[in-house]
C-alpha cells in the first residue's frame, strides 16, 4: 500500500510541475522583441497587452490600441503588419481586415504589462 501512495504522490507532483509559469507559451522572437521595446516605454494607460488569435488559419498577435486615435495593430508570426483592425481617426482602423473581430478564434492573452506607473 505505501508504494501505491508513493507512486500516486509522485505522479501528482509530476503533473503539477507540468503547469508552472516556466512552461509558458513560446512566442516568436520578433514578438519578444516588441515586448522588450514596450518595456522600455512609459507604462500605457490602460497597460499594454498582447493577445494571440487564430485568424484566417494562422496565428496572429493583436496589440490593442492604447488610446482613442491610436490604431490597434495585428501582426503575423513573422511580425509582418497584417492590418490595423480598429482605432485611428475613424475608429475603424485601416479597413484591411474588417472581419477580424467577427472571425478570430482561440483568444489567448500572451503578455500584459504589469509594471506600476
Where are these regions (language model features)?
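Exposed beta-strand-loop-beta-strand "reactive/processing" segments of non-cytosolic proteins
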Residues: 51-67
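Bacterial signal peptide processing site
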Residues: 20-22
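N-terminal secretory signal peptides
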Residues: 27-52
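Structural motif
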Residues: 69-72
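C-terminal motif of bacterial Sec signal peptides marking the signal peptidase cleavage site
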Residues: 15-18
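C-terminal partner/receptor-binding element of secreted or periplasmic proteins
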Residues: 87-117
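Sec-dependent signal peptide recognition
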Residues: 2-9
